[in-house]
Amino acid sequence: MKKILVSVLSSCLLGSALSAVSFKEDSLKVSFEGYKTKDMIGTKGEFKNVEYKFSKNIKDLASYLKGAKATIKPSNAFMGEGNDIITNNITKVFFPALLGDTDIKVVFQDVIAGENKGVISAKITMDKKSTIVPLTYTIKDNKFEAKGQLDLHTFKNGSKALKALSDVAAGHGGISWPLVDISFNADLAE
């Protein structure tokens, strides 16, 4: 009887350990790609030093992600090595015109989890206006990637910010597109 009880307990512990989910904190990354010119050429960037808060419930991915929050400081946008002018245009012209001096807030409200894929309803708040952006996610080789598209025209200063960016960035050819691809990436903790 004792062996059966130990075997059952071991199986339960192993099963719960296998389904426990969390992210490696040093792997978390929020990226974006905006588009410019009449040919819709992409320009990629990321946000550094994002503040994250995840659920302490790690029994499964949906529980871990539901209610997760991120606070993004627009001044921490980084457009890549050697792209100081682009980074400056984004942090000193575009985001101040879009947001003033407020942060971007993200909350994962709902999560539908399938087998290594799913959908997250992300509530994104900028300058006191919120919109829900569906993010589709996949997990492959212990890497999590969620992607969606944000329409900047949703926000009251979206058109103004896009025009300000087009005016200061000659490489835009007078066009900054309102659609921005957004992504959240992380490595799963072992």
Model-derived segments and spans:
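Low-complexity, acidic/polar, glycine-enriched regions of mature
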Residues: 20-190
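Bacterial N-terminal signal peptides
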Residues: 8-16
